[in-house]
Amino acid sequence: MRFIVLLFICSFIYPCYVSSIGFRRISKVSLKKTKCEDGYFQCNSGECIPVDKKCDYIDHCIDGSDEDFECDHLDEKSFITCAKDQFKCKNQECIPAAKYCDMVNDCLDESDEHDGCVKHLNCTNKFLCTDGHCINKEWVCDGRNDCPDGNDEWNCKANKTSSASSCKTENYQYMCANHRCISLKVVCDKKDDCGDGSDEGPGCTQFNCSSAGCQSNCHQTPKGSVCTCKPGYKLQKDNRTCNDIDECQAYGICDQDCMNVPGSYACTCQREYYLENDKRTCKARAGEATLVFSTRTSILGMHVDSEKFFSLATNLNHAVGVAMYGDYVYWSNLEENGYNTIVKKRTYHPQAPNEVIVTTGLALITGIDVDWITKNIYFADEDNHCIGVCTNDGTYCTVLIKDTDKPTGVALLPTQGKMYWSDWGTFPHIAVAGMDGKNVRIFVNVKLEWPKSVTIDYPNERLYWVDAKSKMIESVRLDGTDRRIVLHDIIQEPFSMTVFQNKLYWSDWESNGIQTCNKFTGKDWKILIRNHNKPYSVHMDHSAIKPNIDNPCYSNPCSQLCMLNQNKGYTCGCTLDKKLNADKHTCQDVKKNQHLLIIQGRKFINYYHEFLGKPKVMTLSLQHMSQQSYNNLVNIISDPLSGQIIICHLQLSTPFLTSTTDILRYDPVHHSSEKIVTINKIFFELAFDYIGNNLYTTNTVNQSIEVINLNTKAMTAFYFKDEVPKYIALAPEESKMFVAFQKSMHSISGLTLYEMQMNGLGKRKLIREGLIGPQLPMYYDRDSKTLFVSDLLPGYIYSHSAQDTRILRSGLKSPHSLTVAGDNLFWIESQNKLYSTNFRTASVKQKTVEFDLSKLNDNMTSLPGHLTPYSRDAQYVVTLRKDDIPKHDCQKNNGNCSHVCLPSLITSFICACPPGMELSNDNRTCISHHECSKNEYKCSEHNICIQRNQLCDGIENCPNGEDETSECRIKGRCKENQFMCKNGDCIRLKDRCNSRYDCTDQSDEQNCEKPKCKSDEFQCKFTETCIPKTKMCDSNPDCDDLSDEEDCRKVECTSNEFKCNNGKCIPNTFVCDNDNDCEDGEDEAAEKCYSKIACKMPKMFKCPNGDCISDSLLCNGINDCNDGSDEVHCLSNVTTHLVNCSLNEYRCLGTDICLPKNVRCDGKNDCPQSDDEQNCTYCFENEFACDNKRCIPELWVCDKANDCGDNSDEKNCDGSKRNFIESNECDEFKCSVGTCLPYSKVCDGNRDCPDGSDETGKCQTACTVNNFCKGMCYKTPAGAVCGCQSGYRLAVDMISCEDINECELDICSQMCRNTIGSYECFCKDEFIIRNDKTSCKAVGPAMEFITVTDNDIRKMTHNLHSTTQLLFPLMGVRVSGLDVNAVSDSVYWSNDEFGTIKKLNIRTNEIVTVKIVEHPQALAVDWITGNVYVNDNSHLNTIKVCNLEKGKCATLVKIQDKMKVASVIVDSINRWLFWAEISLEADHPTSKICRTDMTGADMKIIASDLGFVRGMTIDHVKSKLYWSDDFYKTVESSNFDGSQRKVVLTLNMNHALSISIFEQSLYFLSSDNLLSSCKMYGKRSCEHVNIGANNVFRLFSILHISRQVPFANPCDAEYCDYMCVLKKENATCICSDGESIESNSTCNIKNDLKFVESINFSRNTRNISGIYSITIIVLLVSVLLLCVYYYYQKNKLKSKPASNLSCSSIHFQNPSYDRSDEIEVMLDSMASSELSPGQHEYINPINNKGMKAAENNAKKSNQCSEGKNIEEEKQDALIYFVHNSK
C-alpha cells in the first residue's frame, strides 16, 4: 500500500510543476503602427482612439486592447456603491438618477436605456410620453420633439385639461364643457373631440362669421363665431383685431440677438459669430474654441469641435483655478507646505518653464480670471476672504474687496468694467463691483446655498452660476431680471463652470469629468470628458468671447496698477504698503520703510515683504568683513535708532568659560561693519538698549544681568541670589525689560518670565510660569507694545501685551529668531523656512510660508566653525527699520553719567556705576567706596569695598589679594558632616563633588575625582556630569557648562555610529530606517539611503530600488521587488515582458502595473491593492471628506441633510462631528448668529461675527476695570472671561488657575513626569527619547516583521531599503499560530491539521519539528524559558505548555465544552497567561478573556461581553493588554486585571486579523490584507505600513529585542523531573498534568504511565514495519529517480522551476522516538533543496499515524495542483517533500 502511495505522488510531480508556471503574468506585446497624437491611445491593432475611451468597459479597439488587463477592472466592480440620487450602470459607473431611461445613452455600456426600462419610471411632476418615458414639463410645447413619438408637441395649443384663464381663443384654443382644452381647428368638424360633444351642436350652423367683424380669421363654434389671428399675431381685447407678436421676448428663441418683423422674427449673431443653417444657432468665427481645465496634477486642454486633447502643464502639486489668454495659461497652485502661488506658462510650448509670478500673501485661490484688456489677473482667495488683482507678471498686487466671507469664483466683464463673484459663506450671495473694487453691491442673495462658480454669457448678457448644495444651474440677466433655472436633479458635485455659444460646461467631481448641456433648456446633457483625476476649474478661451475695446491703460498712466472702472475709464491702484498720491496716479509709502534681513552664514538677504505679490530678494556678499565675523553667530539685534544691526559672535576657547564675545555694528546701507567692543567673558543671552546705547547680557555663572555702556565701555550689574537670569528682551522707550529666570544653573525645572524695570529696581511682574525652553527667543515690538516669546520645545509662540497673554501659534517645530514687520510676526522653523502670521488677526493654526531658506544652500558653501546652542542652524531674521524716536536724555553726552546711563520710568534716566564704585553727591559721577557698610569688607588698597561673602571665596577681589589669605581655612566653623567652601560657607558633605554647584564660589566641585562615565555616556567638561551620548549636539544643552553642545562639528563618532551634520552621533542602525534621528534628516538623505550598497546578508538579490530579497524569491512568478526586476531574464516557456514605469507613471504596489500619475488620488481604486488611493488628501481644510470621496463644506455636517449622498455627513452627530452652528456650545466665544470665534478675535476692533456681535457691549471696559481674573483675562461683549496659560486650566471658582497633569492625558509614549505648567517625557533603558521629546525609540537593530504568506514564512525589515528573507517554504500549508523569541532569534509556528509545531532558529537555520500536540492552534512563547504555550483544539480542548527541545507537554487549562480558543499570549515579565474563549450564542459569537499565572493557577475573567476575539498583544512597557474583536470591528485595551478597559480603535469596513505592539504603536493587519500602525499615545494617528502586498497574509509578528527584554532564567536553578515553568517570583516544576512539584522531586508514576503507553505503541508499530520499510524505500528511490530524470531531460534548458512546489529533497520518516533508524536520502539532481546548507530539522513525533494516513492518501483524487496536498503527504504519510528555492 505504501508503495502505491509513493507512485501516486510521483506521477503528479511534473503536472504540478508545470501548473505552477501558470502563476506567471503574461504581458501583451504592442504592435504599434504609427504614433498617435497627444491625447490619443494607440491600440495594439494600430488604430488611435481618444485616451478617455480607454478602460471604459467598452471595446473601441478592434482587438479590444483598450480594455485589456492593464485596466485592472477586477474586484472594484462589486464594491462600488452609488448614491441614492444616482443610477448604477452595469459597468459600475454612477450617473444621475434623472438620466436613467431618458432616451439618451448615458452609461458607456448603454445599460441605462435597456428594453422595458420605462416600467420602472415614476413620472410624478413630469410629462408622460406615449411610450412611458418622462420628460420635464418645461420641455412640453417648446417647439422640439423630446418624446420619441413627438407627442410632447401635439395639440400644443390645446392642452388636455385647463382652466378658462389658460384656454384662450387667441391661442387657437377652445374650452369644452368638461374643461378639456382642444384646438379650434377641430371644433364644429362633426367629430366629438371634447368627449362630451360640447364641441359640436346646433350653434355650429346657427352663427355666421360674416357678422363677427374679424380682422383676420373667423371660426364657427357651438357658442358662436370667434375671431383668430394669423401665426405671428395676437388677438386684442376687442376679440376682433390682431397685433404683431414680439417673438423676441420668448426666452432662448435665438442663440444671441433677435429681430422682430411683422408676423415673425429673425435671429442674428454678433460680429464674431455667424448664423448656422437652422437660422437660430450662432457659431463663432476664427477657429475652434479651447476648453482648459485643471486636474490637480496637470493643466489640460481640449479643442471643442474636434475634441482633441493636449497637455499644457504636468506634474503639478495641486492646481485649482485656471484661466487662459493669448500666449499664456495661468493657474493657482496649492504647494505641499500649504501656501498658494499663481503660475503662468506659455501655451503650446511643452518645454516652456512654469513661471511663478505670485508667491506671497495667497491662501486658497479657487477662482481666477484674466482681464483681456489690461492683462491683469483677478482672483478669489477663499481663506483670506478677499478679491485681489495682480499685474500679469506679479510685480504689483493689491486687494480690492476685503470683507467678503468665502469667495469661490470670479467672472470679469471688461466691456463694462465690472466683476462678479460668488460667496458661499454664512450669508451666501453673488456680488458685483467695478473692476477697480469700487461700488460693491449684492447682486443675488435669495435661494442660494453654495454658489460655487459664476460665468458670463457675453453675447446674451446673462450671468450663470452653479449651486453645489441645491444641485442646480441658474441664470439671470446682468440687470438682475429674468432669473431662470437651467438644470436641476442632474447636477451632482460641481466645482467650476463656463459658457460658450449655446452650451454650458462644468467640472463634476462625482463623474470625474466635464459635463455639458444647452444653456437655455438644460437639454443635451452629457459627459463630454472623463478623467482619472478630479477636475477643478474650467475656462473657455476664444477671441469671440473676448472682444477688444480701447485700453485706457495702454499709455501706462499709473505708477503701479491700472484697472478698468465702470465709467469706461481707468483707476490706479497701489500695493498694500503704499497709497495713492493726490494726483491719483502715483504711489507713496503708507508705512515706515522697513524690511527683513535674513542672515544665513555669509549670506545677507534683503527680503522685502509686501504682503501680496512677488517678494524682492537680493543677496549681498560682504567681502570686507573678516572670516571670523561669520563664525559662531550667537545673536543678531536690530537698532531702530540708527537703522543698523548689532552682530554678536563667539570666540571659542578652552576651557569654555574663558571664551570671549565680539560685538560688531553692521551698516546695511553701506555694507560696512566695525567692532565696537569685546566682552571677555561668556554670556548666555544679549539685548540692546538703543536709548542708552547699552548692551544687556545675562551671566548664568554669576547669576547676574550685566549692562555694558558702548560709549564708555563701563559695566554695571544686577545680581540675583536665588535664581538665574537666562533670556532677556528690552523695551527701552518704556524702560522695561523682560527676563526669563531658572531656579538654578543645574535645575531641570521650567523657566519663569517676569517684567522688570531696566534699572533693576522696583517690583517684578509675573508674566508666565512653566515655560519649557530649553531656549526662549523673545522679541518686543515697539509699535504694538507686544512681547513675543517662543517656547522652543513645545513649539508655542506667546504674545504678551497690556491687554492679555495668549498663545499666538502652536504646533511649530522649534520656532526661533522672532521679528516683526508691520502687523506680521516672522520666525524660522527647523525645516529652514521663514514663516509669518498676522499677529492681530491670526488664529492659533494660521501661518504662511514666506521664504524657503533651504534653497539658499543650493549654490552655497557651508559655514565653517562651531554652531553654538544659541544658534540652532545659523539662521537669523531681523527687521531693518530706522524710526524717528524722540530724543532721550541718555543720548545727550550719556546723560552726563560718568559710566552707565540707564533709562528709567520715573526720572527719565539714572546713572549707574561698576561694582566697587558708587555715585557721588551729583548722582552722575561714580567714585570709589570710602566707607564700607557692615556687610562689606574694605580692602587696604584703593579704598575698595567688597561684599563680605567674597572673603575666602577663592577669588582675589582685593588688589593685593588680602581677601584670600591662609587664614581663610580656619575662619569657617563647619560641622563634621559638612564641607566648608572657600568663602567660609558650609554645605552638606554629601553635596561635595556631586557635579552640581552648592557653594556660591563653586569650590565644592574643585579637585574632585572625575566620575567614570559609561561607554555610551558623555562627560561634561566642567561639571564632569555623565549624560547619555545621544543627548550630545542635539541643540538642547544638558550639561550645565553647555559642553555637550560645544565643538559639535569636531566630534568623532565611533565606527558603530553615524555623525549628523550638527555633530550628533547616532547608532548606525538608525540610518535609513525611515525615521529622522538627525535634526535635519541627514540620516535619511536620499544620497545615503539610495546608494548602491550591497545587501548585508548572503544569498540576497539587490533590487534596483534598493530593496533586498532572498535569492529563492527570484523567478517565482511574483513581483517581490515591487519593480519587477526579480522576474526579468527568467527561463520559461512563456516570455514575460515586465514594464519599467516612467517618471510620470505610478506603479501599483506589488505589481508591474504602471498607471499615469494623474490617477493617483483620483478617488477611484485603480490598483489591485487600492494603494493609489492611500495617504491622499481630497478636500480643502474647510471641507468635510465624505466616505465616498465627495467634499462638502464643514457647515453641512450634521445639518440633518444627506449632502454626501452616502449619509456619512450625518453619522456620529452626537459626537465630534456636530455642526458648530447646530451646537449650543462654542469652545470660546459664540456670536449671536451661532458662529464660534476664538477670544483673540473678540473685542479686537474688527467685526469678525457676521452680525458684528463680537465688538459690542463691554468691550471697552472688560479686563481693565475691576479685573478679577488671577490668570489671563479675555475681553468679551458680556464682560471679562478668565482664562489660563498653556499647562493650566481654570479652577472650580472660574477665576484662578490650576496645573494640568498632562501625564493623565497619556501624552508620552512611555513614562511621564508632571511639572508645574508642563510635563517631561522619558523612556525605559531599552529606548531613547526622539527629537519630538514625547516618543521613545527602541535601541538596537531595526525592527523586523515575521510574516506568513500563502507560500512561505518571511522576515522583513521596514525601512528605506527593506530586506525580504525567505525563512521557510510552506507550500500552501496553513499556519494556525505564530510567535517569535527575540532573545534566541527564533520563529515558532503551528499547524493544527497535521499536529506540528516548528521552531526555526534564524541565526543557525536549525529547525525543530515536534508532533506532541494533536491539534495545535494559537501559540505564545515564553522568551525567558523558551517554553511554548499552545491551545490544543482536540476533543479535550486544552491549553498546554510545551518544551520543544525535550518533546514534552503539560496540560495547564481545560477549556469548557463548546468553547474555542483563538488567541493565546504570555507576559513573561509579570508571569501571566492570557487566552480568549469563544462560543456561538444566538447566531453571533461571544467571547471572554481569561487570565492565570503561567502554571495555570488563579484563573480570572478580565473581560467579557465580547464578540470574536481573534488577536491579542501586550504592551510590556505600560503593562496593557490589547485585543481585536472581529465581530464588533474594534481593538480594545485594559490593565492586566481588566480595569481601565476602553476601545482604542474602531474599524469601519474591516476587522483586524493580527495585532502587535512596538514602540507604543499598535500594528494591525486588516481583513483587506493591509498593515497599519496607530500611535497609542498623544494624538492617536494611524498610517499605512507598506511592506508589499505579497509579503503577508493573515498573520504577522514583530521581532525586536526591546519587546522581549532578556532576563535570567530561574529554571536554570531548578532540577525538574518533567518540566519547569515560570511562577510569580521564580520558577516551579510541573508534571504532565500541570501539577506542581518540588525541585528534585519525581512526578507521579500514574501520570507517566499514560505517556509510556503511548511510547510503547509507537515502538511496536515501528518494529513490525521496520523490514517492510527498508524494502519500500529502496523501490521508491529507484522509481522516483527514473521519473525525475525523464522529466528533467524533457524540459532541459526549456524552463527553470518557478514554484515552491518543485521537489528538492526527500526525507523518509518512520514516526518513532527512536531516531537511529531514520534514513535520509538527498537528491542532488533537483534544482534546490528544502533545507539550506547548515540547516537541520529534527522530528519528534509522539504518535504513529503513518499507515492509516498512507491508506487514506491512496484513496484521494488528484489534488496535486494545490500545495496543501503536498504538505499532507509530508506530514501524515511515510515521506514528505521539502523545498527551499534559491
Curated annotation (Swiss-Prot):
Domain LDL-receptor class A, chain residue ranges per copy: 35-72, 81-118, 122-157, 166-205, 931-969, 973-1009, 1012-1049, 1052-1090, 1094-1131, 1140-1177, 1178-1214, 1225-1260
Disulfide bonds: 36-48, 43-61, 55-71, 82-94, 89-107, 101-117, 123-134, 129-147, 141-156, 167-181, 176-194, 188-204, 248-258, 254-267, 269-282, 932-945, 939-958, 952-968, 974-986, 981-999, 993-1008, 1013-1026, 1020-1039, 1033-1048, 1053-1065, 1060-1078, 1072-1089, 1095-1108, 1103-1121, 1115-1130, 1141-1154, 1148-1167, 1161-1176, 1179-1191, 1186-1204, 1198-1213, 1226-1236, 1231-1249, 1243-1259
Transmembrane segments: 1664-1684
Extent of the signal sequence: 1-18
Localisation per UniProt entry: Membrane
GO cellular component, one term: receptor complex
GO biological process: receptor-mediated endocytosis
InterPro entries noted in UniProt: 6-blade_b-propeller_TolB-like, cEGF, EGF-like_Ca-bd_dom, EGF-like_dom, EGF_Ca-bd_CS, Growth_fac_rcpt_cys_sf, LDL_receptor-like_sf, LDLR-related
Residue ranges that the Swiss-Prot or TrEMBL entry lists as coiled coil: none
Membrane topology: Single-pass membrane protein
Extracellular side: 19-1663
Key word DNA-binding present: no
GO molecular function, a single term: hormone binding
SMART domains noted in UniProt: EGF, EGF_CA, LDLa, LY
Domain named EGF-like: residues: 208-243, 244-283, 552-588, 889-927, 1262-1298
Glycan-carrying positions: 122, 159, 208, 239, 702, 859, 896, 923, 1133, 1140, 1175, 1626, 1640, 1656
Entry keyword set: Calcium, Disulfide bond, EGF-like domain, Endocytosis, Glycoprotein, Membrane, Receptor, Repeat, Signal, Transmembrane, Transmembrane helix
Pfam families, per database record: cEGF (PF12662), EGF_CA (PF07645), FXa_inhibition (PF14670), Ldl_recept_a (PF00057), Ldl_recept_b (PF00058)
Ranges for the LDL-receptor class B repeats: 327-374, 375-416, 417-460, 461-501, 502-544, 1385-1425, 1471-1518, 1519-1561
UniProt function note: Involved in uptake of vitellogenin by endocytosis. Expression is regulated by the juvenile hormone analog, methoprene (in vitro).
Name under which the protein is recorded: Vitellogenin receptor
